A protein has these predicted regions:
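A structural signal for multi-pass alpha-helical bundles of membrane permease subunits
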Residues: 1-175
Length: 175
């Protein structure tokens, strides 16, 4: 269930970001896309200690600490997976954004222009014209995401701790 939910969140977020990179001009677009590509290159082990501390002492703008006196411990729950996936920081999200962006750059802009002429907004054009064409890449990225989440032991041990999961049990059998 966790793998399915995380995969759906990853694909939803990465599709919006990939479409934005493919179709819109905004300041520092090349810089932000380079930052996305760098996330593919950097191994997750390099940021594991900061992720562990961030989700062990979770606090947004000091709100929880100001109201309750302590921060939230999100370890031991699937919430860190959901937060990372929804904000495009999850496992292999840079790769999915790159793949989806490349697919969207191959779709002719005349399809979008025709939808704009017919009175569609940007979001309606994305939803009714672009997304139906993008089903092949979305299915491919979903399958990649699901399999990587299902077989991931690193993030499972980091975020979930001692919870029994099939991927964690399989890794102990291999040892």
């Amino acid at each position: 269930i966790v793998s399915l939910a995380v995969s759906v969140l990853q694909i939803a977020a990465c599709t919006l970001v990939g479409y934005g990179f493919a179709r819109f001009e905004f300041p520092f677009k090349k810089f932000w896309f380079a930052a996305v590509i760098i996330t593919v290159i950097i191994p997750p082990q390099t940021i594991s200690s900061s992720l562990y501390l961030h989700f062990n002492f979770f606090d947004i703008f000091g709100i929880f600490k100001a109201t309750t006196g302590s921060s939230l411990n999100l370890r031991g729950s699937p919430i860190p997976y959901a937060l990372m996936s929804a904000t495009c920081m999850g496992l292999k999200n840079g790769l999915y954004i790159y793949m989806i962006r490349q697919f969207f750059t191959g779709i002719p802009k005349s399809l979008e222009e025709a939808a704009y002429v017919d009175g569609c907004s940007i979001f309606k054009t994305f939803w009714r014209v672009i997304l139906p064409d993008a089903v092949p890449i979305l299915v491919s990225c979903f399958l990649f995401s699901f399999v990587w989440q299902w077989t991931d032991t690193f993030y499972s041990k980091l975020f979930l701790g001692n919870i029994k999961l099939l991927s964690l049990e399989a890794s102990t059998v291999a040892d």
